[in-house]
Amino acid sequence: MYNLKVKKLNDDAIIPNFAHKGDAGMDLYSIEEVVIPPGETKLIKTGICIELPTMTEAQVRPRSGLALKHSVTVLNTPGTIDEGYRGELKIILINHGKNDFKVEKHMKIAQMIVKPIYDINIEEVKELSDSERGKGGFGSTGF
């Protein structure tokens, strides 16, 4: 088991938590009230900083309920939090709906998943090996 260290920047901040045992994503909470007009984005503060375990990253993903019920989602999904980042976690939300959306203080606004990463050596080559797929992409397998 890995430990995720969390520092509150504000006494009102909520520590990320899992809604159910076995969930992959832990909920992230807003520390402020913000209105997001239709078609606009806002950067929402969480009031926390984290220290990830060695050789991991955190991915910030949307909450399905916000997307389905309010057409509000995380804009850069998944958002990547690198292991060495120690600043406040902030979530970019976009309102695809037709009405203003009010982010309430302590509202669940996104979920965060901690994933392992690999130590990668980048090697420039003249040629790549062949594969069954080759260069096929962008609908090449049909619709």
Swiss-Prot record:
Its cofactor is Mg(2+). It holds the Pfam family dUTPase. Keywords: Hydrolase, Magnesium, Metal-binding, Nucleotide metabolism. GO terms for biological process: dUMP biosynthetic process; dUTP catabolic process. Its EC number is 3.6.1.23. Pathway: Pyrimidine metabolism; dUMP biosynthesis; dUMP from dCTP (dUTP route): step 2/2. Belongs to the dUTPase family. HAMAP family: dUTPase_bact. This is Deoxyuridine 5'-triphosphate nucleotidohydrolase. It comes from Clostridioides difficile (strain 630). The lineage of its organism: Bacteria, Bacillati, Bacillota, Clostridia, Peptostreptococcales.
